[in-house]
Design a protein with these regions (language model features):
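Charged, glycine-rich intrinsically disordered N-terminal tails and low-complexity linkers that flank
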Residues: 1-95, 157-164, 236
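Short, contiguous clusters of charged residues that form electrostatic/catalytic patches at enzyme active sites
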Residues: 71, 99-102, 172
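Charged phosphate-binding loop/patch that engages nucleotide di/tri-phosphates or the phosphate backbone
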Residues: 220-236
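Acidic-basic catalytic patches of nuclease active cores, encompassing PD-(D/E)XK
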Residues: 89-113
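Nucleic-acid nuclease catalytic cores
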Residues: 106-132, 136-225
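Generic detection of long, well-ordered alpha-helical segments
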Residues: 63, 90-98, 167, 211-214, ...
């Protein structure tokens, strides 16, 4: 008598789907860890705004910038993955980011690659880099899926000057991304599928590369790198 457990086809399909789901999650976790390690100790686009305050004295690093440098020093000299923070709002953005890109592609007829889990970290020298939400021919994309009230505000962004006024953090993020990725323009995309009318859900604006601000970024970044290396020498 064969005592082996006999599974029905439906049950086998369920088990296979569970195994595939677990494998996909494992691969996603591994990719995320690799991404964190690539960024470790580097100044990144998402936080580069921390170097871009107190610009009336461009040749000096303000206190907040020095704090950022110290964090990068600690990451460089310690083992393991850098600390990461996630909130409900951030998870919402992550969950809807790919859909936002798809809606953008439908609207503009532009093709965007390196999205979602296929995003790539682009190094800028040894100490910096960026991870675009998407890349296309001659452009990049930064996608936000904010609170509905914030989406209303973002509808007022039509160009780089508007973005700099409404959210300077994102402005500097995009300018630095253009520097890293060698692009001349970047799309700022805001998407909120909770709006009743579909035409209200997607908003985007072209942000042009600003060479004057790029030079400011390069200046502050070099100051930050110099400070980082100076502090690391204390541990030699």
């Amino acid at each position: 008598m064969n005592s082996a457990l006999q599974l029905q086809p439906v049950e086998m399909n369920v088990i296979q789907s569970l195994d595939l789901g677990a494998l996909n999650n494992l691969q996603a976790d591994k990719s995320h860890e690799e991404w964190l390690l690539q960024r470790k100790g580097k100044f990144t686009a998402s936080e580069i705004h921390r170097l871009m305050t107190a610009l009336s004295k461009p040749n000096e690093l303000p206190v907040g910038a020095i704090t950022y440098v110290i964090e990068k020093v600690a990451e460089t000299l310690t083992d393991g993955l850098p600390e990461s923070f996630s909130s409900e709002a951030m998870q919402w953005g992550k969950d809807n980011e790919v859909e936002a890109i798809e809606k953008f592609e439908e609207k503009t007829r532009l093709f965007v690659n390196n999205t979602g889990e296929n995003q790539k970290f682009i190094k800028y020298g040894k100490h910096a880099g960026c991870t675009p939400d998407g890349l296309g021919y001659g452009f990049g994309a930064e996608t936000k899926c904010p609170k509905s009230s914030t989406h209303v505000i973002y509808k007022g962004i039509l160009n780089g000057q508007d973005l700099k006024k409404i959210n300077s953090d994102y402005y500097w993020q995009i300018q630095f991304s253009m520097l890293c990725a060698k692009k001349s323009k970047w799309f700022f995309i805001s998407y909120d599928k909770r709006f009743s009318k579909e035409k209200h859900r997607l908003h985007y604006a072209v942000i042009e590369r600003n060479e004057n601000d790029i030079e400011l970024l390069k200046l502050r970044l070099q100051l930050a790198i110099d400070k980082k290396l100076e502090l690391i020498k204390n541990f030699k």
